[in-house]
């Protein structure tokens, strides 16, 4: 923009210089005689009217026809000197990217100004051709001016007038062409600028002449005005189809050729009268200069703003270029890093793939091991299920047998009780009968004595058998204790499946032994009951025999009878003690069975834990179970000691009751001892109370005396 504005300023300065020169020349020419007459005055009047109306915009069709006519005339005329003037052409904008936008901008055109002939001719012909083409909304101006004069004075006047008249148009051309002038064409030569100003003045005069001609031809050819208006609208907005414009131009070439010739003839007449219009041109030049100066100031201000914008844009461009370089460096660095990351990722992926393959292989091996362990576990589980079923069956059978035995024992005990009650009633009845038969019993004393001796011997045997049974019961108790100790040891120590099976078999054998001992005790009890029945029968017979004896014998028999009843009661107590011991043994047996079940459950749990551990750690050794803590062991030993103490107390109480039952003197002495102890304790309590009642007030008085000063 700055270069364009500089070019515009240079053009305006040249215009000012030429205007001053023209003014001086006009003042000189006015003193010289005017060759032209009334025709020049008429042309001057017409030119004044045209200047007031302003320049006329020609249609593209007229321009085409004029160019054709001009070419014909050029071919007829002799060769002339041509001065080519480069006009300002706006360069396409930087932001445009399409072909239409670049095509829409006006191009630089050259105007050929034909110089004057050195020989000079009788007549000068002036030929003005104005081409204004519309290339997709863009205006391309090609102006070619040919001037031929016969007289040197007329030629100079025409050039001066044309230069003064076209100063306004040169300003417009500078305005339109200034924004797009490239930097290479910023400083043209002074001679070219002068030629350009002269051509611009000629163009303005010719435009005014063309406007007059166009006004005359408006009525004849209204289509030309319509085409001019359409051309203006086309210049403001781009046309979509360039082919349609070319067709219109070709159509209008023929119609406008004739009109162009007429207009050119009128323009020649007007140019002859240009000299007379110098004074009006001076005023117009003054106005043009004022407008140009104002526009120059505006252009300068705009130039400053545009320079500032240009500086800013350059700074932005430099910053953008630096940023682009930085971005390119970053891009290169990122590409290098990306390549490094890709190589690292490839290495990592290869390593990961190798690890995954190794893991897959190990997973397959572990799956195979897991399948084998599952098969083993299924087989072991089937074995365990079979063992559990067998165990449950044996347990149910044992429990059912024990229940049946208990039911039979209870039935027998009830029967014995019923029989005992019946015997008691029978004994009472028999006592009454014995009183009646006491006399008869005296005769059978010898028999009774013999029977008594035999019964005493049998009683001794029975006592011996009872002692043996007690020993057996003690041995059974010891065995049960040993079984409990074994169970505890089994709880403390981890046992394997083979040891557990052996222990289960041993426990089953011990249970069978206990059952056999219980059965033997029951058989012995039944034998004792049979012997008691026999003795009862014998006693009944003896009572029958004793009825025949005397009273003394009856008394002796009563004593013997009482002794036998005592023995019977003693045997009954023994039976009851045996039944209680049997119940205790059954309770212990149930306890041992429960402990056995608990041991089995713990063994199964330990097996499951071992299997789960062996599934994950096949190479690890089986760890031994840790023993119970110290306080648990102390509690277990304390429980054993308490059980032993309770058993000792029970056995002592049983023996004491037996002793007191057998010895009534001991019972009486125990009674007297208890009474004496109670009385002695009561006496002691009474004495202590009296002593406390006596010592209380004396102690209180002593304390009161001690408090005094």
From Swiss-Prot:
The keyword Coiled coil applies. Residues 78-89, 114-132, 211-222, 248-265 have a biased composition (Basic and acidic residues). It is a single-pass type II membrane protein. GO terms for biological process: Golgi organization; retrograde transport, vesicle recycling within Golgi. Residues 685-707 are lumenal. Residues 29-43, 94-113, 162-180 have a biased composition (Low complexity). This is Golgin-84. It comes from Oryza sativa subsp. japonica.
């Amino acid at each position: 923009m700055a270069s364009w504005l500089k070019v515009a300023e240079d053009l305006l300065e040249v215009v000012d210089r030429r205007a001053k020169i023209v003014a001086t020349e006009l003042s000189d020419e006015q003193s010289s005689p005017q060759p032209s007459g009334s025709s020049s005055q008429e042309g001057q009047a017409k030119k004044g009217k045209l200047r007031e109306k302003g320049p006329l915009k020609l249609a593209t069709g007229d321009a085409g026809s004029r160019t054709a006519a001009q070419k014909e005339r050029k071919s007829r005329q002799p060769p002339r000197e041509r001065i080519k003037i480069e006009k300002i052409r706006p360069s396409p904008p930087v932001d445009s990217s399409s072909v239409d936008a670049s095509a829409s901008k006006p191009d630089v055109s050259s105007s050929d100004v034909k110089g004057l002939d050195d020989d000079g001719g009788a007549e000068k012909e002036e030929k003005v051709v104005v081409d204004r083409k519309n290339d997709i909304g863009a205006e391309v101006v090609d102006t070619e001016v040919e001037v031929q004069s016969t007289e040197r004075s007329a030629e100079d006047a025409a050039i001066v007038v044309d230069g003064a008249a076209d100063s306004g148009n040169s300003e417009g051309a500078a305005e339109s062409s200034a924004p797009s002038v490239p930097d290479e064409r910023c400083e043209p030569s002074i001679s070219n600028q002068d030629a350009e100003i002269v051509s611009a003045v000629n163009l303005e005069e010719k435009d005014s002449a063309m406007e007059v001609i166009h006004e005359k031809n408006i009525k004849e050819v209204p289509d030309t005005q319509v085409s001019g208006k359409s051309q203006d609208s086309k210049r403001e907005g781009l046309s979509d189809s360039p082919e349609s414009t070319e067709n219109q131009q070709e159509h209008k070439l023929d119609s406008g050729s004739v009109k162009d010739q007429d207009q050119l003839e009128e323009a020649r007449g007007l140019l002859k009268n240009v000299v007379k219009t110098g004074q009006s041109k001076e005023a117009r030049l003054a106005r043009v200069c004022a407008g140009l100066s104002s526009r120059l100031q505006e252009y300068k201000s705009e130039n400053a703003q545009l320079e500032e914008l240009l500086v800013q844009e350059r700074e932005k461009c430099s910053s953008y270029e630096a940023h682009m370089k930085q971005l390119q460096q970053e891009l290169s660095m990122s590409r290098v890093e990306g390549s490094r990351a890709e190589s690292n990722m490839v290495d990592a992926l290869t390593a990961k793939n190798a690890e995954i393959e190794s893991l897959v292989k190990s997973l397959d091996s572990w799956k195979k091991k897991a399948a084998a362990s599952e098969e083993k576990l299924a087989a072991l589980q089937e074995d365990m299920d079979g063992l559990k079923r067998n165990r449950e069956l044996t347990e149910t059978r044992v429990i059912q047998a024990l229940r049946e035995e208990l039911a039979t024992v209870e039935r027998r005990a009830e029967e014995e009780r019923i029989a005992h009650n019946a015997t008691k009633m029978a004994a009472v009845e028999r006592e009454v009968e014995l009183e009646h038969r006491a006399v008869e019993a005296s005769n059978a004393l010898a028999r009774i004595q013999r029977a008594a001796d035999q019964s005493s011997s049998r009683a001794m045997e029975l006592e011996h058998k009872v002692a043996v049974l007690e020993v057996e019961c003690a041995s059974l108790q010891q065995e049960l204790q040993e079984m409990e100790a074994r169970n505890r040891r089994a709880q403390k120590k981890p046992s394997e499946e083979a040891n557990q099976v052996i222990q289960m078999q041993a426990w089953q054998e011990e249970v069978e032994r206990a059952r056999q001992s219980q059965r033997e005790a029951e058989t012995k009890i039944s034998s004792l009951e049979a012997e008691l029945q026999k003795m009862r029968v014998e006693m009944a017979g003896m009572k029958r025999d004793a009825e025949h004896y005397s009273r003394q014998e009856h008394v002796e028999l009563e004593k013997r009878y009482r002794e036998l009843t005592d023995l019977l009661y003693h045997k009954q107590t023994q039976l009851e003690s045996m039944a209680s011991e049997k119940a205790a043994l059954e309770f212990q047996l149930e306890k041992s069975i429960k402990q056995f079940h608990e041991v089995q459950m713990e063994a199964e749990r330990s097996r499951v834990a071992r299997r789960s551990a062996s599934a994950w750690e096949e190479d690890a050794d089986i760890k031994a179970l840790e023993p119970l803590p110290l306080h648990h062991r102390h509690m277990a030993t304390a429980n054993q000691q308490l059980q032993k103490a309770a058993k000792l107390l029970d056995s002592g109480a049983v023996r004491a009751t037996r002793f007191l039952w057998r010895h009534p003197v001991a019972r009486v002495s125990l009674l007297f001892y208890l009474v004496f102890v109670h009385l002695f304790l009561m006496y002691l309590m009474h004495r202590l109370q009296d002593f406390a009642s006596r010592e209380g007030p004396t102690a209180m008085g002593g304390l009161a005396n001690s408090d005094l000063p």
